[in-house]
Swiss-Prot record:
One of its GO terms (cellular component) is ribonucleoprotein complex. Belongs to the universal ribosomal protein uS13 family. Pfam families: Ribosomal_S13. It is found in: Cytoplasm. This is Small ribosomal subunit protein uS13. Keywords: Cytoplasm, Ribonucleoprotein, Ribosomal protein, RNA-binding, rRNA-binding. One of its GO terms (molecular function) is structural constituent of ribosome. Disulfide bonds: none annotated. The keyword Cytoplasm applies. It comes from the Eukaryota. Located at the top of the head of the 40S subunit, it contacts several helices of the 18S rRNA.
Length: 153
């Protein structure tokens, strides 16, 4: 149960996975500040770690935070299903994993480079700076391109 008076051990800002997390928010919503962790995954992690969802992030003990970060680091060991993870069947390793913060950025960049290197349709669209997912581009998405006709004086 959340208390009205903050204890002496309350942390206003927590450092989790190289991200500053607001200690005043409830733990489930505070964890969503970390890239790669959404509300559903955060909720599941809190339940697996047996942490009270109504508790503020700054009120969590070091043991509770350690348990949650352990689950985020290795979710398959805690019986989180493969379809719930954000990296499924990795191209290099074939493994399923949950990527967070800097790992996510690195893997996304590598994926785009791989698509460009194999010269597939998606890779070429990324290379040219065009829409990738089949959207029409005749009239929309013109920002940042060449300027139109200049008016005569």
């Amino acid at each position: 149960m959340g208390s009205l008076v903050q204890g002496d051990d309350f942390q206003h800002i927590l450092r989790l996975l190289n991200t500053n997390v607001d200690g005043k928010n409830k733990i489930m919503y505070a964890m969503t500040a970390i890239r790669g962790i959404g509300r559903r995954f955060s909720n599941l992690v809190c339940k697996k770690a047996e942490v009270d969802l109504r508790k503020a992030a700054g009120e969590c003990s070091a043991d509770e935070l350690e348990r949650m970060m352990g689950i985020v680091a290795n979710p398959r060991a805690y019986k989180i299903p493969d379809w719930f993870l954000n990296r499924q069947k990795d191209h290099k390793t074939g493994r399923f994993s949950q990527l967070t913060s800097s790992q996510l950025d690195t893997v996304m960049r590598d994926d785009l480079e791989r698509l460009k290197k194999i010269r597939g349709h998606r890779g070429l669209r990324h290379y040219w700076g065009l829409r990738v997912r089949g959207q029409h581009t005749k009239t929309t998405g013109r920002a940042g391109k060449t300027v139109g006709v200049a008016k005569k004086k």
